[in-house]
Structure formats: structure tokens, C-alpha cells
């Protein structure tokens, strides 16, 4: 589907990542449109959301579209708002009120996040821990290097908090869409690790056993690696996914 817009007709979202973003209303629903820049995030958003659905995870669903913006044609994705009636949206950065301490190893940083979130809001500790590990493990599989505290979202409805669906995968898959085999993946992984800004990384140092349990459950849900091969997503992205799954399960 192709949409046509003029810049002065839409409310752009600024200071929000690398892509051009704005909201539209369609069939009485609100959708976020994310237009590609040079980083070509839309293909990565789509692949990751298709994988998350195959794994049985609660994820934003990205639909591929084309956007003509000021007479220029772009690839883009759109996704329905995940907010329900009565929801209030908070990111972890705002909940904490400050950035977690630097100089912590991965386990120390993870525990710091857990303890300080628990000090700020009323949320079940097991639920909090499991959802953060689920997110971090999925980000590991897709090589998402941009899971910072501002795109980890909690939704409050009444007195209860829940996590938003997974979203924001545009900096995944080693910033590359054209792998034809696995030979170049290790080098790209090393380069990617140096630029990894994620709040939670090195999951092997946090709870490796639990992360492996998650991945095995996800594989069972989607039909194993053969099921991933059947997904309608970029071939290079599939190679990264399968490489990272094997890497994690063999740690």
C-alpha cells in the first residue's frame, strides 16, 4: 500500500530515533508510520516483528508500506498503537529519574535496574525480571544494539503496571540486510558489539540457563529452525537469527 503525505500535513515526532515518524488515523485506529532514512530500519522492524510473532511473543506488528512524502518515495512500516483505554505510558528512564550507574558489569547493571524499578513503582518482581530477560534474550537473537532505557516501556492502568509489546527493532541484524552466508557475521558481530548501547547486554552473564529455556520454548513454538526458514523475511536476517540461536545454545 502507498500513502501520500506532505510534511505540513502530518505531526512529525522529533528527537525520537533515526527515522521520520508520525501518527495517522485509519479506520478509527491510530497507527505510527516510520519512514526509512539511510539506516533502512523498516526492513529490520518487519523481520523482527515477524520473528516475535512466530515465537509467540507479545510484539508490535509492523506492516510494510510505501510513503510518498513531499513527492519523494520511501519504504516504511506502520504499526497500530498498543495503548488501551486508560493506559498511561512510562519509560524506564523516566521511572528511574536518572541514568543507572556506569562501570557495572552486565549482572550488576541488571540487578541495579531491577532493584531501583522496584523502589519506584509497585510491580511484581518475578514478572519484572522475566519480562526484562525475555526482551534482552530476544534482542540478543536479533542483535538489537539500541535497547536503551527510553524504549523499554511500562503501561499503567489503574494501579497495575504491565510491559508494552516489544517494539523498536530498527537497529538490529548488524545494520545489514544482504548476508548470503554466515562467513561475515562474526566480524560484523565484533564491530556491532563496540557500538552496542543497550541497557541490558551480555545475557550469558545474567541468567544463561533461563535464556536458553526461552529460546528452546520459542523454537518449539515456531517449528524449529525449519520454521524460521519458512518466515517471509529477509534472507540475511534469517542467517543472523540462526547464527545467534546456535551461538547462545552452545554457550
Where are the regions a protein language model picked out?
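ATP-dependent phospho-/nucleotidyl transfer catalytic cores
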Residues: 80-136, 225, 247
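C-terminal catalytic region of ATP-dependent kinase domains
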Residues: 36-40, 53, 155, 159-251
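A broad, structural surface signal
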Residues: 46, 50-54, 130-138, 246
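Conserved ATP-binding subdomain of kinase catalytic cores across diverse folds
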Residues: 1-101
Amino acid at each position: 500500500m502507498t500513502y501520500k503525505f506532505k510534511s505540513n500535513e502530518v505531526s512529525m515526532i522529533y528527537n525520537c530515533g533515526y527515522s521520520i515518524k508520525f501518527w495517522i488515523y485509519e479506520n478509527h485506529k491510530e497507527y505510527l508510520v516510520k519512514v526509512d532514512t539511510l539506516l533502512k530500519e523498516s526492513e529490520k522492524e518487519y523481520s523482527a516483528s515477524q520473528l516475535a510473532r512466530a515465537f509467540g511473543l507479545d510484539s508490535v506488528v509492523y506492516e510494510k508500506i510505501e510513503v510518498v512524502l513531499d513527492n519523494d518515495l520511501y519504504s516504511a512500516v506502520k504499526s497500530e498503537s498498543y495503548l488501551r483505554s486508560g493506559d498511561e505510558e512510562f519509560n524506564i528512564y523516566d521511572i528511574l529519574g536518572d541514568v543507572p550507574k556506569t562501570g557495572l558489569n552486565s549482572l550488576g547493571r541488571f540487578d541495579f535496574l531491577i532493584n531501583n524499578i522496584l523502589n519506584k513503582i509497585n510491580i511484581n518482581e518475578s514478572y519484572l525480571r522475566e519480562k526484562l530477560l525475555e526482551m534482552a534474550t530476544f534482542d540478543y537473537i536479533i542483535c538489537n544494539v539500541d535497547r536503551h532505557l527510553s524504549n523499554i516501556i511500562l503501561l499503567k492502568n489503574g494501579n497495575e503496571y504491565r510491559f508494552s509489546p516489544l517494539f523498536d527493532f530498527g537497529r538490529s541484524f548488524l545494520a545489514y540486510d544482504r548476508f548470503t552466508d554466515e562467513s561475515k557475521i562474526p566480524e560484523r558481530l565484533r564491530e556491532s558489539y563496540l557500538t552496542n548501547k543497550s541497557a541490558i547486554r551480555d545475557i550469558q552473564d545474567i541468567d544463561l540457563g533461563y535464556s536458553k529455556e526461552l529460546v528452546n520454548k520459542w523454537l518449539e513454538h515456531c517449528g524449529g529452525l525449519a520454521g524460521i526458514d519458512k518466515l517471509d523475511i529477509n534472507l540475511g536476517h534469517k542467517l543472523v537469527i540462526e547464527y545467534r540461536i546456535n551461538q547462545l545454545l552452545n554457550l
